[in-house]
Design a protein with these regions (language model features):
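A short Gly-Trp-Pro
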Residues: 1-125
Length: 125
């Protein structure tokens, strides 16, 4: 899931209406509000109790999901300890085992790989 982050004031839904599902983050204990299409159920974007001025837009909702160039200056991979089996992390992007900051706002030190790195726990059964 690629999730560009924008300011809430810059987001506009231009058609239809969304419904909201609230999910409590296991990491912060704060609510994550999942906004989805009321007609078809497609996830559109997220807003956050923890970061009230920000929203994360699901890349698959853009007409052209490749419009945003992703690199070390504008991207990060978080919660890589819970990554899907055989997830490939590209080089040069800051990565974090969990969130990029602690619950009190203290920034965490990223790990930046020089080569592509395969992560994720193997499946059993």
């Amino acid at each position: 899931m690629v999730e560009p982050i924008f300011r809430v004031v810059d987001l506009r839904v231009t058609r239809g209406r969304s419904s909201i599902y609230d999910h409590r983050s296991e990491g912060s204990g704060k609510l994550v509000h999942i906004h989805f299409c009321a007609s078809c159920g497609t996830k559109l974007y997220m807003t956050f109790e923890r970061f009230e001025a920000s929203c994360g837009v699901y890349a698959g909702t853009f007409d052209d999901p490749n419009w945003l160039q992703i690199g070390g200056g504008n991207a990060k991979h978080i919660f890589i300890e819970a990554a899907r089996h055989e997830t490939i992390l590209p080089p040069g992007i800051p990565t974090f085992l969990q969130h990029a900051m602690t619950n009190d706002g203290t920034p965490q030190e990223p790990v930046i790989f020089e080569k592509p790195r395969v992560v994720g726990k193997g499946r059993t059964g």
